[in-house]
């Protein structure tokens, strides 16, 4: 197939199927300096959302209470994984050797003056 045919097939497939935000979306060509982020929670949310690991759809995790209000855009970095090795690295850098992994993609908090609405 030519590049033009491959690009056309990709566009067609993207209309039929949704890429899994954890595995099917690139971290970005300029990573680690500039990364793609999948936003799960925006500051105005009264509900905590989370990507369902099996389907990739955004699901309701639990209601947000006043004590755990998220003041920034919060989400994940695609194609990353916080496993034992990552936890040890971060723990050593933070001076906290007791850190453990959570088996999820790496979290990200996005600081911006621009509004980012939900659009999954």
Indicate residue ranges for each PLM-predicted region:
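Hydrophobic N-terminal alpha-helices or hydrophobic patches in metabolic proteins across all domains
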Residues: 1-120
């Amino acid at each position: 197939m030519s590049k033009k045919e491959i690009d056309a097939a990709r566009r067609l497939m993207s209309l039929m199927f949704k890429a899994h935000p954890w595995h099917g979306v690139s971290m970005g060509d300029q990573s680690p300096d500039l990364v793609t982020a999948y936003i799960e929670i925006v500051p105005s949310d009264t509900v905590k959302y989370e990507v369902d690991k099996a389907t990739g759809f955004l699901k309701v995790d639990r209601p947000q209470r006043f004590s755990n209000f998220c003041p920034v855009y919060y989400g994940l970095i695609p194609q990353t994984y916080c496993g034992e090795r990552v936890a040890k690295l971060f723990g050593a850098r933070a001076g906290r050797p007791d850190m453990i992994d959570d088996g999820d993609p790496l979290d990200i908090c996005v600081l911006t003056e621009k509004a980012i609405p939900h659009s999954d």
